[in-house]
């Protein structure tokens, strides 16, 4: 997989950088694995906006992805690599020996015709799913379960992978993409290898309209709004916030306040917290 740059024929193509989609082998999804999905546009069950700047965009059909990998010890053949409009990662269409078809997150390097399998005594190969207890130390894994049997909940985005650091008792220590080291039960399943389409981080949409196609609406700073729209709004010209610190549109402290509960039960499973990202690495001054 590679990325494509365009000649500056228009302002939109001047900055546009996209993936070349060379790994996509079929344009049409598997009919039995797609369902329609109501788009909530950032609203909750009461119709109140809880996530701003969402709405519009091209219509989508949801692909049913197998995050559990619960067909144990049954060989599956990778029949195709498909595009998924709901995520940056690609999907691999599996044909099982018993005739069932399923989608999984496509690992990096997976090829059409390759066989994958899930179980406790399976080969140590990329794309195979197995419990963390049998994975070699130093292995790169993705689609990690937090609770056995619940399905993969971590490390699912394009190019992501976690590393098996240590095994002790009933737990396995994983170094997550955020650099956090967390303990996970050894019976939880994960898939060997990293998620494919890692070049997505080097792409650029090129124009605002392309972002609208993805269902993202324009973002506006609170300081240029009216007081009725945002706590930062109002004043003459470029007025300061007028508060001790920045807040969210709902008046809660923002930018730096820790929101994780101090007494959360899973705190004991976090061996090392994630590295703090300085303002220098985000393009601003170091804090």
Swiss-Prot record:
Gene Ontology biological process terms in this record: translation
Region (Disordered): 221-287
Signal peptide: none
Basic residues bias (residue ranges): 258-287
Superkingdom of this protein's organism: Bacteria
Keywords attached to this entry: Ribonucleoprotein, Ribosomal protein, RNA-binding, rRNA-binding
A Pfam family this chain is assigned to: Ribosomal_L2_C
Alphabetical list of Gene3D superfamilies matching this protein: 2.30.30.30, Nucleic acid-binding proteins, Ribosomal protein L2, domain 3
InterPro entries, sorted: NA-bd_OB-fold, Rib_uL2_dom2, Ribosomal_uL2, Ribosomal_uL2_bac/org-type, Ribosomal_uL2_C, Ribosomal_uL2_CS, Ribosomal_uL2_dom3, Ribosomal_uL2_RNA-bd_dom
One GO term describing the cellular component: large ribosomal subunit
Gene Ontology MF terms in the entry: rRNA binding; structural constituent of ribosome; transferase activity
Cited PROSITE patterns: RIBOSOMAL_L2
HAMAP family: Ribosomal_uL2_B
Entry function: One of the primary rRNA binding proteins. Required for association of the 30S and 50S subunits to form the 70S ribosome, for tRNA binding and peptide bond formation. It has been suggested to have peptidyltransferase activity; this is somewhat controversial. Makes several contacts with the 16S rRNA in the 70S ribosome.
Subunit text: Part of the 50S ribosomal subunit. Forms a bridge to the 30S subunit in the 70S ribosome.
UniProt similarity note: Belongs to the universal ribosomal protein uL2 family.
Protein name: Large ribosomal subunit protein uL2
Gene name linked to the record: rplB
